[in-house]
């Protein structure tokens, strides 16, 4: 017999290291052709941080994305970015990139103000040009501005570093400000359980995430889809088998330690809940671990809803389902 159930999982997640210093830095240099090189140490492990930092720099400098060249993770030339963990890189390295861009823009604005006969604070940077905000017709292209910079013997370079505004936790009552910003999410999962074989199919998932202002919508959606899939494996497949006599792992290879494949991935609907004003770059928040976390309780709750049985461990393997069904029948 096959039974269906639905479950909900919600979470909040602090971005970055808990109350500990975890800074990151970035360098920016703008070249004579109006392109820019952005350098930072953060490792892109597939989540797309290199693309995100390029987009952040392009937005802050007012340049096309194609004009931004990124160098990351090269310890010979890039500044320290800290670990790619705790969903921290968008917030911390992203802000470092913005600060580096702003430092470079100070020299750019000084030179442009001299040429356009205005104060530096009257200028805006957009669409590969610098212009007077109140009179956009009075403008210079980046190429013209960089030529003026060269003639004046100036360089458009910047360095920025960012450390979240946190405090450590007081040992007597654990009070403090452990995180500068939090992400929130809720995931709903629908499953179908085969009571004879114990197999569980995840049919459909809806996952809504507070993302602040997304830097790249498609990458955020992909991050959520990846987290949902990892959560599915966490609950239903990824069982570490240990030899109790010697402590050795009995399934140490990917052929025996099973993770989801494309055929296992359910229908996933990602919902990006946007908000403004947060401390991240343009209000952005990280969606690394948050993409995974609520999927786990959602699937567990859906199985419990289908069977009417409580589970207190993961993974929930077919043998566990069959055992629970037999226990109900007694």
Curated annotation (Swiss-Prot):
Most stable at pH 8.0. Unstable at acidic pH values. Its cofactor is Se-Mo-molybdopterin cytosine dinucleotide. Binds 1 Se-Mo-molybdopterin cytosine dinucleotide (Se-Mo-MCD) cofactor per heterotetramer. The cofactor is bound between the NdhL and NdhM subunits. It comes from the Bacteria. Heterooctamer of NDHM, NDHL, NDHS and NDHF. Dimer of heterotetramers. Catalyzes the hydroxylation of nicotinate to 6-hydroxynicotinate. Also active against 2-pyrazinecarboxylic acid, but inactive against other nicotinate analogs. This is Nicotinate dehydrogenase medium molybdopterin subunit. It comes from Eubacterium barkeri. The gene is ndhM.
